[in-house]
Amino acid sequence: MKKDTSELKIHYKSLKKEIKQRLRQFSALPAPDYFYELCFCLLTPQSNAKKCWQAVEKLKKCRLEGRKINSRRIKSCLRQNTRFYRKKAKYIKEAVKKWHLIKEKITKIKDAAELRNWLADKDNVKGLGYKEASHFLRNIGKSQNKAAILDRHILRNLKRYGVVREIPNLNKKNYLLIEKKMIDFSIKLGIPLDELDLLLWAKETGNVFK
């Protein structure tokens, strides 16, 4: 069933300038900061995004790149700010080890869908699924309006607006199917996918963040 989207369009009009500014900030992110955006996206599952960013700020002070990896130090940065910090510390440790390869792929693979597929492969980056890989690409300005971040805020709104009937388990097949529906929805609204994601997130949380 189609739902009225007039209120959403009004909300977009009020936030459009801020949303576009945030996306410009993502696109202008210096390459050395990509690593910490990856850390952020590894931390966010089942955790508060702003608290996760506080943990990332602590990680930045540790300057993990190029250093001997100190698991205890990583855990201490995460403990107060994210759930399942022990497991996520392991993911970050692995990301440090593989960062040279990850950087190379970000540079070489120009298509967002292809790059996300590589990032979401657990043999390449542990702890990243399709949602987290999409989030990472958006936050470094490389999602090309092709990668939906299907978190609980977005999924609730897609159901609310009749884009999906129910919220299924997000295996790869279902993720790509719902993503296609969200892209079609964004086209009908006249709102680019990356902007729609930030709009729906702001609608749920009250602010345009990451």
Say what each PLM segment does.
Residues 1-28, 89, 106-117, 124-210:
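C-terminal accessory module of base-excision DNA glycosylases/AP lyases that mediates lesion recognition
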Residues 1-62, 68-76, 80-82, 209:
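Structure-specific DNA junction-binding interface
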Residues 31, 40, 44-47, 80, ...:
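Conserved aromatic-histidine-acidic binding/catalytic patches
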Residues 33-41, 53, 86-93, 131-134, ...:
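Non-catalytic, well-ordered alpha-helical scaffold segments
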Residues 48, 64, 97-104, 138-142, ...:
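Short helix-capping and hinge/turn segments at secondary-structure transitions, especially at repeat
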Residues 56-126:
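Alpha-helical ds-nucleic-acid-binding substructure associated with the helix-hairpin-helix region
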